[in-house]
């Protein structure tokens, strides 16, 4: 691809990153207000975690189905952008309706289901769109640009949660939806500029099935470790040295490391390969999570959290690059959909810890500080086993 084409592809990745940012913001708004919404609809707040678990189940199933659908229609649909925009508008209408669905539990749950199903248009399809127009050597860099949006939203979520206290839910639901749809509109325009300048299709050999299976198994194990570390362990670790009010300023350190590490990682992927980089990141990240568990000063904890975030950032760039390369045989959708489904399953397991009563089990409490490191090191071993003579 020539330089102008590369610039247009980078612009498309930036637009997708912006879409991912605003999509992640809508999820934060949803989680913040869900207890209030279910209570207004006559549902006990104790059901909130199970509703979130159900959301993740829907995400996992629909993401895989959407991925296969994208692969099936890739030759019959010239541009994915308009389809993504149309489904996003439907998803946005369902999302805006949530604060008004207090007449009955059934209405609220139906609106949540519609939103959960249609929001799949904003996960794997934009990535498949990017893969359609990108040359293989640029995938790590473009993945980094896209993931930056998600990382920034994750870093901002504690501040957003504080800012939304006492705000009428109808306001953030409306504003977040409008900004998201506007961002998707920009994505449509960016895609239109690229259609006439797309790279020729690359006929790469499919990866060995065993390697693909081991990759997704490793990703699931590593994602479980990430969920245990960041969502279950990080706050208690910080509270050894800080107050609850400080958490909003301390938790984003992980995501700062994540974001900064992605940029050099995008270059390392091209030299080492995606799976070897994931394995190295998993091993280093496992040691970093142990450092978090046993840090005896606040500066040491902050440093270990930063390093853990950096390792997860490098692993994420490698994972998305690997999934995109696995799909370069015309099956980008299914591999990306499976990646998002794996991440949803890991989130599901983390959310279910508290309502299932597992968090109160003494044995689980004793093992929890060790779980992230164990999971990440196990993922590293799976990735070593998955490595083939050819780079992923």
Over which residues does each language-model region extend?
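Helix-loop boundary and gating motifs at the non-cytosolic
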Residues: 2-59, 212-218, 222-240, 247
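Helix-to-loop junctions at the C-terminal end of transmembrane segments
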Residues: 62-78, 261-274
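A membrane-interface helix-boundary motif in multi-pass transporters
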Residues: 79, 162-179, 354-376
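Structural signature of the two symmetry-related core transmembrane helices
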Residues: 80-96, 276-291
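Intracellular juxtamembrane helix-capping segments at the cytosolic ends
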Residues: 121-134, 314-328
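C-terminal transmembrane helical hairpin of 12-TM major facilitator-type secondary transporters
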Residues: 275-316
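A late C-terminal transmembrane helix in Major Facilitator Superfamily
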Residues: 330-360
């Amino acid at each position: 691809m020539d330089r102008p084409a590369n610039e247009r592809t980078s612009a498309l990745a930036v637009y997708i990153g912006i879409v991912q940012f605003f999509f992640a913001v809508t999820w934060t708004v949803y989680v913040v207000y869900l207890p209030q919404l279910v209570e207004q609809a006559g549902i006990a707040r104790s059901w909130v975690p199970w509703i979130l678990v159900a959301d993740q189940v829907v995400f996992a199933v629909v993401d895989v189905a959407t991925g296969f659908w994208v692969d099936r229609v890739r030759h019959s649909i010239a541009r994915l952008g308009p389809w993504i925009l149309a489904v996003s508008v439907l998803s946005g209408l369902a999302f805006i309706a949530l604060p008004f669905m207090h007449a009955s539990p059934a209405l609220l749950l139906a609106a949540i289901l519609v939103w959960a199903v249609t929001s799949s248009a904003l996960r794997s399809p934009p990535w498949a769109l990017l893969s359609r127009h990108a040359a293989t050597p640029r995938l790590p860099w473009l993945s980094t640009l896209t993931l930056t949006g998600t990382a920034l939203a994750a870093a901002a979520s504690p501040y957003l949660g504080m800012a939304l206290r006492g705000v009428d839910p109808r306001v953030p639901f409306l504003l977040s939806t409008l900004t998201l749809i506007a961002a998707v509109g920009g994505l449509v325009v960016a895609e239109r500029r690229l259609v006439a300048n797309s790279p020729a299709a690359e006929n790469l050999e499919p990866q060995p099935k065993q390697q693909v299976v081991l990759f997704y198994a490793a990703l699931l194990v590593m994602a479980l470790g990430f969920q245990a570390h960041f969502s279950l362990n990080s706050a208690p670790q910080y509270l050894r040295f800080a107050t609850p009010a400080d958490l909003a300023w301390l938790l984003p350190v992980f995501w700062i490391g994540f974001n900064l590490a992605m940029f050099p990682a995008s270059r390392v992927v091209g030299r080492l390969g995606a799976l070897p980089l994931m394995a190295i990141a998993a091993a280093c990240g496992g040691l970093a999570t142990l450092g978090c568990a046993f840090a005896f000063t606040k500066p040491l904890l902050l440093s270990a959290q930063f390093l853990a975030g950096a390792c997860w950032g490098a692993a994420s760039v490698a994972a998305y690059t690997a999934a995109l390369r696995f799909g370069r045989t015309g099956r980008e959708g299914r591999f990306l959909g499976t990646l998002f489904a794996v991440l949803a399953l890991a989130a599901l397991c983390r959310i279910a810890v508290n309502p299932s009563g597992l968090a109160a089990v003494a044995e689980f409490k004793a093992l929890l500080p060790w779980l992230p490191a164990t999971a990440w090191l196990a993922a590293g071993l799976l990735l070593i086993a998955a490595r083939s003579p050819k780079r992923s």
